[in-house]
Amino acid sequence: MLAVWVPLLLPFLAVPLARRLAEALPPRAAAWLLAGTATVLAGGTLCSLGLLATAGLLQLPPVAALGHLSLPWLTAAAPSAPVAAALAGPVLAVLAALAVRTARRRHLELRAARAALPAAPARPALSALPAHGTDPADERTGPHPAHRPAGVQHADMRPLRASVRRARATRWLRSSLTLLRQPVGHQLAVLDDERADAFALPGRLRRPGRMGEPGRIVVTSGMLRALSGPERAALLAHERAHLTGRHHVFLALAEHAADLHPALRPLRAPLGYHLERWADEVAAARVGDRAVTARAVGRAALAASRSPWPARPRLVAAAHAGPVPRRVAALLQPRPSTTPATRLRAVALALAACLALTTAATLEATADLHRTVEAAQHEPGAPR
């Protein structure tokens, strides 16, 4: 099972390649590249550790008996599996604890930030749709049976009513999906606070018993007073771009990937930078002036550095985050090129090879373990 070790080693090679390639790409493409690389490599790491732990568990007598496996054959086929499992098992437990800690911390920070904001008006769009589960038979299209003329005979209407019910349910589903695909109006929350801060607060998904909430742009009165009118427009466009692009999902993926493999931690800072550059470019296009956007970024960062709002979550996007001088310099230059340099094609090919090899090695290791289990089950000494 040599293939199972490949996804654990390739991140040390792929991460520098991804960072090098991202520098030559436009901000949006760079953010997708870094987030995708982190996701693929973290998934391969998790699968490899799981396969190593599973291979060792299969050699435990109770597990072998439960799976009708020949324990002597398994021991001879993979003598080092228990040692690898003894290492992979605790590592998986630590990674699970880190993932829970990261998710819990993010949840508590977002909940505290939402609690500190004024109540947002409810989103009425879903109320215009038919209630899910309503019986369409209650909305009859024909006259009520009590109002029909006497002596008139009617065929059995149950098949027709079932067809109408299915058609209306299909229309309700299509309307719901259309609504979800439409851009959500992000609400603005202005806090009466002298401390200057502004950030994009992610919304909450709709769950049973709880209505969802759209994302909100949070800005303090201190931040608004620190900027001019055009600069305020650029700041709000920047934060709106974070919400529209779901940049909080990118940040969460990078944070969890860094918990799974130490080599993936260097991807967090460049991903945060390219997400801010992505929002900078959207804001510059929205206000139509790159210099105004650059001034807004610089002044917002200067104002927020004095006394930021204490309830701002750590894993949220903000206009004053990241290497601000570098972002301002990029905004004061022409629009970035959308084509990477020719000399970086080799870097792109090498990174693609690393990601493809990670995926192929994970699939091969999984198939290898499956073949081992099947062979152990068909051995003459396997319990029946």
Positions of predicted regions on the chain:
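Cytosolic-facing loops and C-terminal tails of multi-pass membrane proteins
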Residues: P7, P11, V15-P16, A88-R105, ...
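Alpha-helical membrane segments of multi-pass proteins
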Residues: P7-L10, R20, T37, T54, ...
